[in-house]
Swiss-Prot record:
It comes from the Bacteria. One of its GO terms (cellular component) is ribonucleoprotein complex. Belongs to the bacterial ribosomal protein bL33 family. The gene is rpmG. Keywords: Ribonucleoprotein, Ribosomal protein. InterPro entries: Ribosomal_bL33, Ribosomal_bL33_sf, Ribosomal_zn-bd. The lineage of its organism: Bacteria, Fusobacteriati, Fusobacteriota, Fusobacteriia, Fusobacteriales. Pfam families: Ribosomal_L33. PANTHER family: 50S RIBOSOMAL PROTEIN L33, CHLOROPLASTIC (PTHR43168), LARGE RIBOSOMAL SUBUNIT PROTEIN BL33C (PTHR43168:SF2). This is Large ribosomal subunit protein bL33. GO terms for biological process: translation. GO terms for molecular function: structural constituent of ribosome.
Length: 50
């Protein structure tokens, strides 16, 4: 079952990325490096609750 998740920046708390994940195969929280347009660099984004 794929669900949509929101990613939040750990530095600026921006939430402007969404993605999907399979909860059955990846039950842990998602973390990935994404580009932050405010800081103009890549930062760590973590999965948040809606």
């Amino acid at each position: 079952m794929r669900v949509q998740v929101i990613l939040e920046c750990t530095e600026t708390k921006l939430r402007h990325y969404t993605t999907t994940k399979n909860k059955k195969t990846h039950p842990e929280r998602l973390e990935m490096m994404k580009y932050n347009p405010v800081l103009k660099k890549h930062t760590l984004y973590k999965e948040t609750k809606k």
